[in-house]
Every structure is written in structure tokens, then in C-alpha cells.
Curated annotation (Swiss-Prot):
Keyword Nucleotide-binding: yes
Similarity-based family: Belongs to the amidase family. GatA subfamily.
SUPFAM superfamilies membership: Amidase signature (AS) enzymes
InterPro entries for the chain: Amidase, Amidase_CS, Amidase_dom, AS_sf, GatA
Catalytic activity, reaction form: L-glutamyl-tRNA(Gln) + L-glutamine + ATP + H2O = L-glutaminyl-tRNA(Gln) + L-glutamate + ADP + phosphate + H(+)
Biological function: Allows the formation of correctly charged Gln-tRNA(Gln) through the transamidation of misacylated Glu-tRNA(Gln) in organisms which lack glutaminyl-tRNA synthetase. The reaction takes place in the presence of glutamine and ATP through an activated gamma-phospho-Glu-tRNA(Gln).
Complex formation: Heterotrimer of A, B and C subunits.
Designated name of the protein: Glutamyl-tRNA(Gln) amidotransferase subunit A
Name of the top EC class for this enzyme: ligase
Length: 485
């Protein structure tokens, strides 16, 4: 019995029935990591000893008849910008090389308390700045569907690990599409919750008003299960909302009769791969057959989302990343004359090219004389975009679009063309600007590569997204596709 072929909810059932132990499941996945990860490069740190100790402790609890929580012994991986006690937390950057977190992020704490077994930390674009996981200071993660292609980013390690069956579940972060776009490229399910639904405490900040921890799994049920575990108010993060978290498993119904879905015409213009467009239109027919009503709408300001996003995200990054100074941990320059030198030289040597570029852009946008012209204007555009979404959700339950304009591209193909790389997030960025939830799920194949469908919902309506996504998933077979490694 190969336990790596099972989804997390299936493993949970097998473990609860005592048909298999948590330790056996953990060992099987660790073995798969050892066999596969040299090809995929999803992991930055493998926590073999910690994982086996945690698995044995959970088996001990089960032997005493104790409940081990919602995850019930399922293994998972954590993106390397989310703190896990006594594990590295490098953000895939040299400036945090060797840094070991002394505490758990709230989401890591939640995962552990609900019986999740953390197998290690996953690769990412440095400080979550990128869409391909080529910006990691340590290694380039490869797409399990084609090892010459990118897995997406910045949570590329998370998506690749799930798609290659190294883990059934993973946590990532999503600032402008960093969970959904890799999910699309790797043919899995990825959810970015509403801003404020999940705690950011213990997560290294990139854009504090845009960042949100998201979940990745091989089907909608797994994604819903992990989202249930990490959602809720947290006194350590004042931006979390004290709004009831529904039982997401109850929303996994195939019935979507009467659901109203909006289709923004601006998301189906030039730049969208015709094969991706066909997959989305084919998916719409499934939603119609299942009883949903689909209407074309207009989101004219969505065209300005990328511009506003890069101003806001970079401005926030320039402030957030000022704390990495080479003094207390991580890389410290050796060719220094004084304390000021430590700060400037350590940062210059240790930050990667993309991170430096975004810090400089953000500092420029916040500087005297440019604040009103750029940053303040971007805030105004953000409010207008939020208003457009709010107006649509007065009449509709959800909005559907592609997740990305193309399938996964070749490693190195877009590294010299920043604009083309940034435009890859054209459908995902508006979601973060508005703070709404969105899910990506597989809906087709283009040239042998997965295509993702994005469903956007109203604030704190993740249950509606799970309902729509589950209905589609159960009517199709795309979630059963797997790469052949």
C-alpha cells in the first residue's frame, strides 16, 4: 500500500480506523521526499527526526483513545517564511541563512495542535518576491509536470511538493497570487483566504496589507480541511477578524443550483493563451450544467491592479525588510569598517537582485515629492477596485476567471523580462488588492501542462468557494491527473 497516493482526508480516515499508524504514513512520505526531491527541489529543509518523533507521539495518543485533531496525522510541508519552532526560517534568502526560529507561527501551532506532522520547510522566491521560484538564493524548484519548467511562485516549493506527492498538504503565502498561480501551474488546488481570516503572526512580512497564508492540496476537500485548521481570530494579529468560521466540510456539496457567477470581460482579452481560454469556457459549461447562472460583467479598474499592486507591495516591503540588518542573525559582511557599514554591506551582499529592486522601488514611491504622485494614488486605486468588487458581490455569489494567462513556462524564459513576469499575475493580483478570497483548481490541460480556474468570492465566503469548487471537481476528472516522475 503506497500511502503517498492518498489524500490527507483519506489518510486521516485510515489512521483513525487503526489500519495504519501515523509513523508508517510519515515514513512513507519521507521516503518519497528522499527519492523525488533531488529532481524537484521543493524542500529547503527536511525535518526527518522531528517528524518521526511527532508521529510517534500522535500514535501514543491514539493508543490511549485520545483525539489527535482535524488533520489526524496527515503529513504536510510549510513554506520557508512561516516560523516553525526549532526549524530554519530563511525566506530563501542569504540574509537569513542559518536562522532558526525560536517560536511557532500561529498557523504552525494550529497545524501541530490538530495532528499535522510537519516534514520540513519548502522553497520559495526570496522573501516571496517572484512568480517562478527562480529567485530563491538556494535552488530553483522544478515543475513536476515538466522538470524544465517553473512551478510558479512564490510558493513554488509548496505546490511542487504537493503535486509530486511528497506531501498531501502544504501551507504557502499569497501576496499577489503566490498560492493560486503555483497551484495552477502544478495542477493542484490552492486557496487564498480573505485578508483577516488567517493569522499572520510568525509569518515574515512582505506586504502587510496584502499577505495572507493559504492552503494547497490535491483536492478541494483537503484544502477545506487545512483551511479549517488555520482559520480564526488570533490575539497576536490584530488584523484577524472576529468572524465565525463555518464548518467548511459542510459546504462540500455538489448542489450549486441558482448560484450566480460573474464573468469579467476584462479578464478575457489579449495576452490570454487560447488553450487556457478554451479550458475556462469548457469549465463554465460544467457550472451551467450543475445549475449555476453565468453573466458577463465589467471590472474596468482591474487593468490598473498590477500597477497599484507593485507600488503598494514594494512600499510595504521597503519598510518591512529594513529590519534585516546583518547584526543579530543571518549573513553579516566581513569587509566592514563601522556599524553603518555592517548594515549597508550585509544587505547589499545578501539580498538578491529582485528583492533589491523592489526595496528600491518602494523606497522611491515613499520618498518626499513622490509619495502623493505614486503611493497615495495607488491607495486611491485600491479603494476603487475594492468598490468594484463589492458592487459585483451585491448581485453575484462568485466571479470566475483564469488563474494565470498561460500554463507553466520554461525555467529562464522570463527572467530578463520583468514586465512579462509581472503580467503573469494579472488575474490574481486584484484579489489581494481587494482582500477577497479566491481558489484555484485544475480545469484542463494545454500542451500537456495543467490549466487553473480561479473562483473569487465575497469577504469571508470561503464556504461558497469550496461549494462551487467541489461541485466542479466532482463533475470532472482533472483533479485526478498526476505528473509522472
Amino acid at each position: 500500500m503506497d500511502f503517498t497516493n492518498y489524500k490527507a482526508h483519506e489518510l486521516k480516515d485510515l489512521i483513525s480506523k487503526k489500519e495504519v499508524s501515523v509513523e508508517e504514513v510519515t515514513k512513507a512520505h519521507l521516503e518519497n521526499v528522499k527519492n523525488i526531491d533531488a529532481k524537484v527541489n521543493a524542500f529547503l529543509y527536511i525535518a526527518e527526526e522531528e517528524a518521526l518523533n511527532d508521529a510517534k507521539a500522535l500514535d501514543e495518543k491514539l493508543s490511549k483513545g485520545e483525539d489527535i485533531g482535524l488533520l489526524g496525522g496527515a503529513p504536510l510541508g510549510i513554506k520557508d517564511n512561516i516560523s516553525v519552532k526549532n526549524m530554519q526560517n530563511t525566506c530563501a534568502s542569504k540574509i537569513l541563512e542559518g536562522y532558526i526560529s525560536p517560536y511557532d507561527a500561529t498557523v504552525s501551532e494550529s497545524v501541530k495542535s490538530q495532528g499535522g506532522v510537519i516534514l520540513g520547510k519548502l522553497n520559495m522566491d526570496e522573501f516571496a518576491m517572484g512568480s517562478s521560484t527562480e529567485n530563491s538564493a538556494y535552488k530553483i524548484t522544478r515543475n513536476p509536470w515538466d522538470l524544465d519548467r517553473v512551478p510558479g511562485g512564490s510558493s513554488g516549493g509548496s505546490a511542487a511538493a504537493v503535486a509530486s506527492k511528497e506531501v498531501p498538504l502544504a501551507l504557502g503565502t499569497d501576496t499577489g497570487g503566490s498560492v493560486r498561480q503555483p497551484a495552477s501551474f502544478c495542477g493542484i488546488v490552492g486557496l487564498k483566504p480573505t485578508y483577516g481570516r488567517v493569522s499572520r503572526s510568525g509569518v515574515v512580512a512582505y506586504g502587510s496589507t496584502l499577505d495572507q497564508v493559504g492552503t494547497l492540496g490535491r483536492d478541494v476537500k483537503d484544502c477545506a480541511l487545512l483551511t479549517q485548521v488555520i482559520s480564526g481570530v488570533d490575539h497576536r494579529d490584530f488584523t484577524t477578524a472576529n468572524i465565525n468560521v463555518p464548518n467548511y466540510e459542510n459546504s462540500l456539496s455538489e448542489n450549486i443550483k441558482g448560484k450566480k457567477i460573474a464573468l469579467p470581460k476584462e479578464f478575457f482579452k489579449d495576452g490570454l493563451d487560447p488553450k487556457v481560454q478554451k479550458s475556462i469556457y469548457d469549465a463554465l459549461e460544467v457550472f451551467k450544467a450543475n445549475g449555476a447562472e453565468i453573466t458577463e460583467v465589467s471590472l474596468p479598474l482591474a487593468d490598473y491592479a498590477i500597477s497599484a499592486y507593485y507600488l503598494l507591495a514594494c512600499a510595504e516591503a521597503s519598510s518591512n525588510l529594513a529590519r534585516f540588518d546583518g547584526v543579530r542573525y543571518g549573513h553579516r559582511s566581513e569587509s566592514v569598517e563601522d556599524a553603518v557599514d555592517v548594515y549597508f554591506k550585509s544587505r547589499s551582499e545578501a539580498f538578491g537582485k529582485e528583492v533589491k529592486k523592489r526595496i528600491m522601488l518602494g523606497t522611491y514611491a515613499l520618498s518626499a515629492g513622490y509619495y502623493d504622485a505614486y503611493y497615495k494614488k495607488a491607495l486611491k486605486v485600491r479603494n476603487l477596485i475594492k468598490g468594484e468588487f463589492e458592487n459585483i458581490f451585491k448581485d453575484f455569489d462568485a466571479i470566475i476567471s483564469p488563474t494565470a494567462p498561460t500554463p507553466a513556462y520554461k525555467i529562464g524564459e522570463k527572467t530578463e523580462n520583468a514586465l512579462e513576469m509581472y503580467l503573469g499575475d494579472i488575474y490574481t493580483v486584484p484579489v489581494n488588492i481587494a482582500g477577497i478570497p479566491a481558489i484555484s483548481l485544475p480545469c484542463g490541460v494545454a500542451d500537456g501542462l495543467p490549466v487553473g480556474l480561479q473562483i473569487m468570492g465575497n469577504y469571508f465566503k470561503e464556504d461558497t468557494l469550496f461549494n462551487l469548487a467541489y461541485s466542479y471537481e466532482q463533475s470532472t476528472k482533472w483533479h485526478e491527473m498526476h505528473p509522472n516522475l
